[in-house]
């Protein structure tokens, strides 16, 4: 009997479980969304027509994910705030939390006061379940508004406001100055707050969430609840914060616009986010 080369056998085994993908996890910015911050009609059609359940996994708030959820007609579980919130959309379009990881109120107050005192030029805002808050309108807030098409709630007396808040999921800072970004990150690390995670997103964003708010933990929760094996899952991503997600699934697919070190862990590299890469990848690699 002719011996079949091992790499061919492995490839054939992978193709077997590609035909049985039961859930896809998908990053948004740089992955699902194009450079205009939108899901193109053609991409949405390709994804919907595949008929495979999709979970969006994002650092965004639910309100910033809504347009994509609607475009893909998603009714299942979604992951927001880098895993700080697992939720689904109710019959009346309300956000129904399934699992939450919020930042402690005293920590939120300490962070906001410290950042504003030492870095007054940095754009600073924060999120609860349904709202985006800021204390001034600046370049960063305008940039985020143009990207997400959301409008923040302006807070006049932040101390008084925070006394009544206990459900902050994310603190977000935006700066377009690289030196300022490095100094800000160094300052936040020096606070040595054990219950938070500080993550850089792209060139201009620094985001703070609960220590347990991680994309990988959100995915692990869904895998347990739905009793899915690794081989039954796929994921699409482009950034370093997507690596844990990509490593958790059987079929990690990376965008053409990703960095080379992200591409190195991919089973397949799909087209870029401006070329309907997610829809193309599903139709060509997962069906």
Question: What annotation goes with each model-predicted range?
Answer:
Residues 50, 72-74, 82, 191-194, ...:
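Short, structured coil segments at secondary-structure junctions
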Residues 6-18:
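Short, Lys/Arg-enriched N-terminal segments with co-localized hydrophobic residues
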Residues 19-20, 39-40, 207-287:
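Mg2+-dependent phosphoryl-transfer enzymes with acidic/Ser/Thr/Gly-rich catalytic loops
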Residues 33, 102, 209-213:
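Conserved beta-strand/loop elements of the cytosolic catalytic core of P-type E1-E2 ATPases, chiefly
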Residues 20-35:
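Asp-based phosphoryl-transfer active-site loop
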Residues 121-236, 257:
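Conserved acidic, metal-coordinating active-site core of Asp-based
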Residues 38-141:
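Active-site phosphate-binding/coordination module
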């Amino acid at each position: 009997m002719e011996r079949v080369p091992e790499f061919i056998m492995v490839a054939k085994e992978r193709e077997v479980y590609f035909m049985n993908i039961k859930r896809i996890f998908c990053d948004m910015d740089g992955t699902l969304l194009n450079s205009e911050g939108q899901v193109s009609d053609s991409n949405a059609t390709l994804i919907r027509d595949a008929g495979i359940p999709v979970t969006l996994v994002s650092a965004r708030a639910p309100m910033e994910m809504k347009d994509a959820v609607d475009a893909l007609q998603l009714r299942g579980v979604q992951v927001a705030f880098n895993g700080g919130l697992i939720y689904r959309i109710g019959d009346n379009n309300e956000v129904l939390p399934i699992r939450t990881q919020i930042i402690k109120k005293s920590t939120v107050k300490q962070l906001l006061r410290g950042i504003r005192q030492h870095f007054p030029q940095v754009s600073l805002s924060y999120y609860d379940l349904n709202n985006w808050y800021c204390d001034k309108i600046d370049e960063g807030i305008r940039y985020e508004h143009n990207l997400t098409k959301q409008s923040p709630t302006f807070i006049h007396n932040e101390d008084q406001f925070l006394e009544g808040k206990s459900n902050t999921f994310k603190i977000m800072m935006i700066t377009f100055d690289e030196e300022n970004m490095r100094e800000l990150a160094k300052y936040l690390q020096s606070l040595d707050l054990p219950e938070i995670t500080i993550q850089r997103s792209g060139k201009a964003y620094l985001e703070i969430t609960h220590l347990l708010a991680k994309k990988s933990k959100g995915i692990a929760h869904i895998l347990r609840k739905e009793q899915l094996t690794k081989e039954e899952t796929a994921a699409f991503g482009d950034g370093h914060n997507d690596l844990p997600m990509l490593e958790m699934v059987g079929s990690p697919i990376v965008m053409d616009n990703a960095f080379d070190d992200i591409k190195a862990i991919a089973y397949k590299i799909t087209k870029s986010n401006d070329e309907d890469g997610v829809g193309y990848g599903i139709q060509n690699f997962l069906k």
